[in-house]
């Protein structure tokens, strides 16, 4: 199987997000890379499901709370940006202050 660099990056995000999701379910607080991967993967899946950019920008602030992550992580993540594939093409989704 041959994957492009973009496909490899998406796959890496999904794998990291899966690890983060399992840790979150066990009550383990997520670190910075895990939190970013978790939010990014949720945004990518929402786009594939047909949600709008505006919906994802709003929902993206609800995926994780301060209780889900290690101390200091919310302050480290001011924005999460992802080029997500929507039914009508690829668009940039930006979520400001995603962890509240």
UniProtKB/Swiss-Prot annotation:
Subunit organization: Heterotrimer of UreA (gamma), UreB (beta) and UreC (alpha) subunits. Three heterotrimers associate to form the active enzyme.
Keywords of this entry: Cytoplasm, Hydrolase
A Gene Ontology BP annotation from the UniProt entry: urea catabolic process
Residue runs in coiled coils: none
Official protein name in the record: Urease subunit gamma
TM regions (residue ranges): none
Keyword Acetylation in record: no
EC number: 3.5.1.5
Pfam family, one: Urease_gamma
Compartment(s): Cytoplasm
Pathway: Nitrogen metabolism; urea degradation; CO(2) and NH(3) from urea (urease route): step 1/1
Keyword Transmembrane set for record: no
InterPro entries per record: Urease_gamma, Urease_gamma/gamma-beta_su, Urease_gamma_sf, Urease_subunit
Lineage: Bacteria, Bacillati, Actinomycetota, Actinomycetes, Mycobacteriales
CDD domains: Urease_gamma
Family: Belongs to the urease gamma subunit family.
Enzyme class: hydrolase
UniProt catalytic activity: urea + 2 H2O + H(+) = hydrogencarbonate + 2 NH4(+)
Gene Ontology, cellular component aspect: cytoplasm
One Gene Ontology molecular-function label: urease activity
């Amino acid at each position: 199987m041959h994957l492009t660099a973009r496909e490899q990056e998406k796959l890496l995000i999904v794998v990291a997000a899966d690890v983060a999701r399992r840790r979150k379910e066990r009550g383990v607080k997520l670190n910075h890379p895990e939190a970013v991967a978790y939010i990014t993967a949720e945004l990518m899946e929402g786009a594939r499901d047909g949600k709008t950019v505006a919906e994802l920008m709003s929902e993206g602030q609800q995926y994780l709370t301060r209780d889900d992550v290690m101390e200091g992580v919310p302050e480290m993540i001011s924005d999460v940006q992802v080029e997500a594939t929507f039914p009508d093409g690829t668009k940039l989704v930006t979520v400001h202050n995603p962890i509240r």
